Amino acid sequence: MSERMKYIRNFCIIAHIDHGKSTLADRLIEKTGFLSEREMDKQILDNLELERERGITIKLKPVRMIYKAKDGNEYELNLIDTPGHVDFTYEVSRSIAACEGALLVVDASQGIEAQTLANVYLALEHDLEIIPVINKIDLPSADPERVKREIEDIIGIDASEALLTSAKEGIGIEEVLEAIVKRIPPPQGDEDKPLKALIFDSFYDNYKGAISFVRIVDGKVKRGMRIKMFSTGKVFEVTEVGSFRPDLYPVEELKAGEVGYIAANIKNVKDTRVGDTITDADNPADSPLPGYKEVVPMVFCGIYPADGEDYENLKEALEKLQLNDASLVFEPDTSAALGFGFRCGFLGLLHMEIVQERLEREYNLNLVTTAPSVIYKVYKTNGEVLELDNPTKMPPPTQIDHIEEPIVEATIMVPTDYVGPVMELCQERRGVYLGMEYIEKTRVLLKYEMPLNEIIYDFFDALKSRTRGYASLDYEFKGYKKSDLVKLDILVNGEVVDALSMIVHKDKAYEKGRKIVEKLKENIPRHLFEIPIQAAIGSRIIARETVKALRKNVLAKCYGGDVTRKKKLLEKQKEGKKRMRQIGTVEIPQEAFMSILKLDDQK
């Protein structure tokens, strides 16, 4: 190992939402004198407005600090940020692979949460040195000793030397820096071997093209070199390399062990895939770094402009977002009810919400979204297998042999008082109980196998409301399982409304269908003819409501008189209404669609 590499430390921070990760990062940057107080912006590393608002980290932003340790040497510390949310697990695993150590930040008053656990296990798989940091010790409810015991019980790492800090008050920051220098090993690697660099993130710059954030494992990279991507085999010429002092800072070359960025006039972030290996095109390495996999969208939904004229703007906005977010996929889609729009694929629910919110906020679009769905595998009787992400493409029931749906293993961490309601919720959502273990006396770790379809809709909200916000959830994809699923169609005035079709479990179809028709009845205005609203599975109607017609009182001018006269007038009115119903069309207002998507929130 070269002399230079002894003084490099690459580390990441693992923490649950709101346990103080970004604030701690700010303090470390401030302490190393890297930015003046004036430049210190709260939560330097969270660039998107949305990130600050929700207090979550979505896009990673690495930073390089120089720290003069107590032993008199100057160390280069590279902090690689990790997103803390389940949707971005693969991104987290790549960030972790770029480090040798991790700070595990736990809130002194709350203890460990399910998502933190998932990320810690990832870090342990990559053999990282984990330094527990118990943050927010200035809070009156802080109980560092209990949290230490939790860390030892649950994760099984020694917490006797856990650091006690308060990032907000700036307590214990120096100890954290010293621990990074002393306890995290320096990077391994050989700068004389052919270049191998791991991409752990990328973003799109209007002038320089797609910029890859890399950790150099072997070899070195400098301007003018030709580089090759392992996954696509494409070759580019390097135009700039540099490090992060939070902003991009060009340097001559990056060598093994260092963290930095590479710009090479790459037109599309699809070519700088997270987890891919970059090598020298003229002297390539034999094999890529392990662990790369293509990111597969798990959740799909249709996004349509509320105003048809916004279609082009929506397309442009999605293309711009895709420049920075390679995991977002979309294709044009049309719906008889909603007009032209796009079918989009996301990593998970949070990802979907963020994309929708950014479209509405940053591009001022008014959107209508259809109910989210997952990818089903439909096995047809002729031996064909279809992968369905859109319920409207489902073949007729007679052609289907069976359907498989994606299953996830959910880990739920919950206070003991709420175990009952949570188990009940999981059972309602077709969960299969796998096991539970008590952590301390106050909290329980529950494991369930559940269909992704049941989680994706509003499971998280329901979980939070039944546990008053105390539960935390983590899930990982397990595979596909055969299930009894049917397509539920909604007919308004005898015509199928494609935007409302959904795939549901047979046992829940009746209840779901009934709820939707009731909701639609409230939201569709009365017309001059009566409108039947029906829920159907195939050709079988399972629920019906009728929106009564508005009618004129045709008997108003009959005073007394013969009953047959009245009958004649009523019959005539009825005939007219019948004729009207055959040729009339029903406009379904936007609110009706929205009300159906929010159905489950009212439980």
Curated annotation (Swiss-Prot):
UniProt main location, coarse: membrane
Mode of membrane association: Peripheral membrane protein
EC number: 3.6.5.n1
A GO molecular-function descriptor: GTPase activity
Subcellular location: Cell membrane
GO biological process annotation, one example: positive regulation of translation
UniProt-listed InterPro entries: EF-4, EFG_II, EFG_III/V, EFG_V-like, EFTu-like_2, G_TR_CS, LepA_C_sf, LepA_CTD
Highest taxon listed in the record's lineage: Bacteria
GO cellular component: plasma membrane
Catalysed transformations (reactions): GTP + H2O = GDP + phosphate + H(+)
Annotated positions binding GTP: 18-23, 135-138
PROSITE patterns named in the record: G_TR_1, G_TR_2
Enzymatic class: hydrolase
Ranges of residues in domain tr-type G: 6-188
Keywords of the record: Cell membrane, GTP-binding, Hydrolase, Membrane, Nucleotide-binding, Protein biosynthesis
Role: Required for accurate and efficient protein synthesis under certain stress conditions. May act as a fidelity factor of the translation reaction, by catalyzing a one-codon backward translocation of tRNAs on improperly translocated ribosomes. Back-translocation proceeds from a post-translocation (POST) complex to a pre-translocation (PRE) complex, thus giving elongation factor G a second chance to translocate the tRNAs correctly. Binds to ribosomes in a GTP-dependent manner.
HAMAP family xref list: LepA
UniProt similarity note: Belongs to the TRAFAC class translation factor GTPase superfamily. Classic translation factor GTPase family. LepA subfamily.
Name of the protein in its database record: Elongation factor 4
